[in-house]
Design a protein with these regions (language model features):
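Short amphipathic alpha-helical segments, especially helix-boundary/capping motifs
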Residues: 5-9, 34, 70-74, 121-126
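Generic alpha-helical secondary structure signal
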Residues: 23-26, 58, 77-81, 143-147, ...
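Surface-exposed alpha-helical segments enriched in charged/polar residues
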Residues: 30-37, 84, 147, 151
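Donor nucleotide-activated moiety binding/catalytic core segment of transferases
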Residues: 46-103
Length: 166
């Protein structure tokens, strides 16, 4: 009887290489690195995996060299606290990024992974159909436009960011 079973629904049978999947991070990090060097800022990486943080740190160090800090959440400081203290949060397809938007914090969604792996469900705001780009998001890779979106959102105040995004 099928009522005594449960179903696990897998995503489409996508065959994606690790290098292809994480090329989105590499592309975005190169832009962030350029901006941070121009503005004299450090990039703070909000670590995702407590148990694999050395592996994650090494990934970022390879791209950013020494131009970053690495925050690991704890009982005293959660990922939400780290985001709340940031001038701007940038994400590719993190749930925490969308949560940060809903909390009214200046956030930029650079949802370029869908274009890279040919899967529209990675586009910004999916499943809602959104324009391919807006004042604080983009769903395709355009180096110069991404650069401009990040710089613009860093430079505007929170009130203007909210008025443009809500």
């Amino acid at each position: 009887d099928s009522r005594n079973n449960f179903n696990f629904l897998n995503r489409e049978n996508l065959k994606i290489q690790w290098e292809q999947y994480y090329s989105a991070e590499k592309k975005i990090l190169e832009i962030l690195k350029k901006i941070s060097l121009e503005m004299g800022l450090l990039i703070n990486i909000c670590a995702r995996f407590k148990e694999r943080n050395k592996e994650e740190y090494n990934f970022y160090e390879k791209i950013l060299k020494k131009n970053f800090t690495f925050s690991i959440s704890s009982k005293n400081e959660t990922q939400y606290d780290i985001c709340d203290q940031s001038e701007l949060v940038v994400f590719i397809d993190s749930t925490l990024g969308y949560e940060n938007i809903s909390r009214g914090n200046k956030t930029v969604g650079l949802s370029i992974r869908g274009e890279i792996i040919n899967d529209k469900s990675f586009n910004f705001g999916w499943p809602k159909t959104m324009k391919p780009n807006g004042p604080s998001w983009i769903s395709y890779y355009d180096h110069m436009l991404i650069y401009k979106i990040i710089k613009y959102n860093f430079d505007i105040d929170n009130e203007k960011w909210i008025s443009e995004n809500f």
